[in-house]
């Protein structure tokens, strides 16, 4: 079996309805997967039931059977029984903390490596990389480790933007990622702009959407990656 993973930058683009822009990207992963488990652990400011309802509504036209992992007495068994895994956005630190709490990190990695489709957005994309060291989120809770799912062997930065508000004196996103590459100059970081996604199919990795992505690695800083690019070399 081969990895089939879709890593979305965000759940929305601008004012579009929830997950609507992503439906064309998501649909191919559902061709042979009807029963999906949704992991809402990144959702800190809403109930898990509310979060689940939003996802079910957003993906309704795909006619999937989606349940929340919080509805199952045995989270590990729920993942094993599902045809596919969905992980939503929110706070990446809380998400990874809960994945470790319920002993799901290695299980999810194993299931995805064995061919179970994976779809993540925002925090759900953050945890698909080597670690969560390039998330934008506030560290509101401390997971046992920053080591993540390693579905792709590099770092991700969803919601990438290098906008600086006039008069604002804080660091830009590019400056923050430069800091990472100074500490770890050999690990690539891919900044994914809202509306775009990475799709891994086995040993192939491609950039989907309407916006370029940006690569940071060592002395290479904010290198544009054109839409449709083959990024398979990042998997080696």
UniProtKB/Swiss-Prot annotation:
GO molecular function term, any single one: serine-type peptidase activity
UniProt key word Hydrolase: yes
Name of this protein: Peptidase E
Pfam families linked to this entry: Peptidase_S51
Major place of residence: cytoplasm
Catalytic residues (UniProt): 122 (charge relay system), 137 (charge relay system), 159 (charge relay system)
Free-text function comment from the UniProt entry: Hydrolyzes dipeptides containing N-terminal aspartate residues. May play a role in allowing the cell to use peptide aspartate to spare carbon otherwise required for the synthesis of the aspartate family of amino acids.
Recorded catalytic activity of this chain's protein: Dipeptidase E catalyzes the hydrolysis of dipeptides Asp-|-Xaa. It does not act on peptides with N-terminal Glu, Asn or Gln, nor does it cleave isoaspartyl peptides
Compartmental location: Cytoplasm
Xref: SUPFAM superfamilies: Class I glutamine amidotransferase-like
Key words of the record: Cytoplasm, Dipeptidase, Hydrolase, Protease, Serine protease
Family: Belongs to the peptidase S51 family.
Entries under InterPro entries matching the protein: Class_I_gatase-like, Peptidase_S51, Peptidase_S51_dipeptidase-E
């Amino acid at each position: 079996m081969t990895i089939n993973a879709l890593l979305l930058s965000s759940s929305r683009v601008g004012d579009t309805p929830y997950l609507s822009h992503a439906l064309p990207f998501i649909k191919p992963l559902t061709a042979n997967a009807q029963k999906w488990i949704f992991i809402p652990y990144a959702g800190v400011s809403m109930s898990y039931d509310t979060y689940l309802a939003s996802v079910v509504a957003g993906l309704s036209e795909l006619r999937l059977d989606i349940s929340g992992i919080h509805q199952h007495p045995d989270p590990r068994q729920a993942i094993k029984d599902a045809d596919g895994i969905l992980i939503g956005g929110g706070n990446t630190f809380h998400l990874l903390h809960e994945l470790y709490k319920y002993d799901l990190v290695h299980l999810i990695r194993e299931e995805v490596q064995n061919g179970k489709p994976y779809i993540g957005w925002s925090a759900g994309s953050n945890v698909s990389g080597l670690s969560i060291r390039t998330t934008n989120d506030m560290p509101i809770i401390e997971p046992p480790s920053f080591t993540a799912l390693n579905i792709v062997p590099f770092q991700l930065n969803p919601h990438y933007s290098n906008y600086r508000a006039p008069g604002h004196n804080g660091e830009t996103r590019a400056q923050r990622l430069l800091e990472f590459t100074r500490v770890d100059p050999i690990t690539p970081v891919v900044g994914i702009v809202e509306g775009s996604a990475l799709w891994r199919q086995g040993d192939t990795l491609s950039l989907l959407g309407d916006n370029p992505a940006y690569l940071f690695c060592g002395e290479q800083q904010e290198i544009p990656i054109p839409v449709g690019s083959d990024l398979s070399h990042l998997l080696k």
